């Protein structure tokens, strides 16, 4: 947001121990004549999907659309309303629904759909979203910060998720920046909420058998994210631990990993051959049946402990529960550590 008075802006990054250190700073005067004051690009009418109160007293969540033509605005609004309802089906968002205002904007695109470079598809869309970010075929991001900020500035917001007009599975979530999700994918109920969890509460991915575009330190420093730890004997969620649960907490890890590695081979083969998305949907459904049974019938299923395997690593990082929306596409919902983290953010913004 534009400051009302001169400010100093400091950019910080995390060091090897996940501690913030300043890397650059500059002074900004909002009256500086070099600041551009041209009109913002056309974003279309602001849609109030849910207005619970004054933006000063609520969490303001903005859903943006990318890759929708002017003729597809109705499609976007329908999908935006759908994902809003899906978000508020999940605890703790469900219990805090009235703490949220939800807005939507959809700048018209000249082309329908978004870029997917790995298959030769390139589109010029208002927000610039694209698959294949950082070489990961399912990672959807925009690197045009100014483009989406210019559109988002036409609405009240603290949090933003970009719905892409696409069916291929893909999305992304960056803490305190934005999240994305492919609106037409069959797993949108999981995908939209999972990616929003990254953006809204800084939740870590708890899965660790999928190919990812990041590399962790071999030293395994304590993660800054609230739902992963390198210290299973003294986890950051120790106040939530179930009585009598051993630490670290045993689970059918080897069986899960053996099955998951075979599943990942099938997944890569489908993408490598550019086979129909229906085949990926079928694979996801098959995997969900297996994982739901394995993770839901274990000795410590539903208990809070310290289960090894999280934050993209099979060893050295632990999650609070055996299953979670940040771990699988199952219907487990958010784990205890995630729920507490989400509620903490809601309390920061809602009065």
List the predicted regions and their residue ranges.
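Solvent-exposed loop/turn segments at secondary-structure junctions
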Residues: 67-70, 108-112, 166-170, 186-188, ...
